[in-house]
């Protein structure tokens, strides 16, 4: 086993990963034919019940903080639009990213209300409530930390419902508080619900290319319950969800951004999914019904997250909500890598240089394995004459050949697989970094230096992939080889070119990691070879032994 054969192993692992990702993308949930529906009527949390027939439109109320711009429809009090002011739609754009939207082409809303026997949002009780607002727009003033938007509705029975949205400075969590003042003469049975509704098929303006080259990022629903910390739920799943739990949350996810309803922790809640239209999907919760006696008041509340997937803030809002950051099947490596990267960034202030430092750290930790790898390869090269003589002596007796080879390895204390172990360990780290770069919103539009303005996107001029290919070429030329097969030699010759082509579409942050890793390999290679020379296991005078 030598360095150039290791390149074949890397290529095999890499191609296997590419095939697996391509299969995952091809077999991802496929949207049904689009049938656009624009409505502010909820499914009320019961898949068997039909939505309320369309009724008169309410007034649109605009709400602005330092990080959010929301549009609330007074018909039902749903949030129909949400713009994230700190996140541009595209690199260099002054237009903020729009997460929630209500247009003829696309619907993505955060709905909430009161159902139950006497709930004003119950379809059996007529059209959804038309709330009254004191203002048409609300803006968080300078120096103020909290903004409250109260909406009021008086039912036919005289009951007064106050729905208050509470937003805080530099926060993406929106508290939705209900106060029910039962001024009627009969008890009110009410159930609080919150749900997210979205068109399953993305129109062109919403398709931001989250299916990056060889990477499929999840777009769909998810939930957390007492039994499952984090469970994805595809839009095209036939069986509707029905889970009763205490605490937890329901969410809709996409690359970098999420919306989530977090119900109150006291009492139990039922999580559900429904399809209110051919091209619509919902996920939501229903709380335990409460009874408000005549003359009494009752408070019900839930919290909506609408914003970027900021792991620290999401974890503070609800347990396991930070798991919505999609790091794929290598999340257990990606998460600590991101925490380390974020810690380094806190001192340096540049994500690109942080990636360089984390590369040195990873390669430093793995140096003992790298040294063992090169030592094992050197010993294997020293055994080549004995192995060749053994082949000539034994001939075609494969069983005897295998037995004597293993005996030789044992007597010489050589592990034939010793050169593979570091590669097997490095590959998951490489892929975990890939997922981290594509799943962490902190790296979205994060600049490095010179022409690299977005570490999560490919190099626009392909300079980094070419540099990566050059470093691979030098590693190949500096590595001793025992490859004699002409076909393998040709494959080795073109390996840097093949990898360069692969990396043309990879995130520049990942290519940067690989370049630095290759440079560290060259340095470590020279240090290790000097030690091997002293032991008589390596000669700089010739590349073939």
Swiss-Prot record:
Pfam families: 60KD_IMP (PF02096), YidC_periplas (PF14849). CDD domains: 5TM_YidC_Alb3, EcYidC-like_peri. GO terms for biological process: protein insertion into membrane; protein transport. Signal peptide: none annotated. Residues 31-54 are annotated as: Disordered. GO terms for cellular component: plasma membrane. It is found in: Cell inner membrane. GO terms for molecular function: membrane insertase activity. Its main location: membrane. It is a multi-pass membrane protein. It comes from the Bacteria. The keyword Nucleotide-binding does not apply. Keywords: Cell inner membrane, Cell membrane, Chaperone, Membrane, Protein transport, Transmembrane, Transmembrane helix, Transport. The chain crosses the membrane at residues 6-26, 342-362, 417-437, 455-475, 496-516. Belongs to the OXA1/ALB3/YidC family. Type 1 subfamily. Interacts with the Sec translocase complex via SecD. Specifically interacts with transmembrane segments of nascent integral membrane proteins during membrane integration. Required for the insertion and/or proper folding and/or complex formation of integral membrane proteins into the membrane. Involved in integration of membrane proteins that insert both dependently and independently of the Sec translocase complex, as well as at least some lipoproteins. Aids folding of multispanning membrane proteins. This is Membrane protein insertase YidC. It comes from Serratia proteamaculans (strain 568).
